[in-house]
Swiss-Prot record:
GO cellular component: extracellular region
Coiled-coil region list: none
Protein name from the UniProt record: Temporin-1V
Main location: secreted
Propeptide section residues: 23-45
Pfam families per UniProt: FSAP_sig_propep
Length: 62
């Protein structure tokens, strides 16, 4: 019983460390993405182009 508790505790500890490292890496990637102006422009274009397409198709269709 004691060895089972030890191994479960070890798995929990390793899983917690792995999860925290993944969160830190994801946060760093998000900060890096926000700081890079080229990628910000690409994100704006991705949001802007479909909107323009819908507006133009609405105007042409009428």
């Amino acid at each position: 019983m004691f060895t089972l508790k030890k191994s479960l505790l070890l798995l929990f500890f390793l899983g917690t460390i792995n999860l925290s490292l993944c969160e830190e890496e994801r946060d760093a990637d998000e900060e890096e993405r926000r700081d890079d102006p080229d990628e910000m422009n690409v994100e704006v274009e991705k949001r802007f182009l479909p909107l323009v397409g819908k507006i133009l198709s609405g105007l042409i269709g009428k």
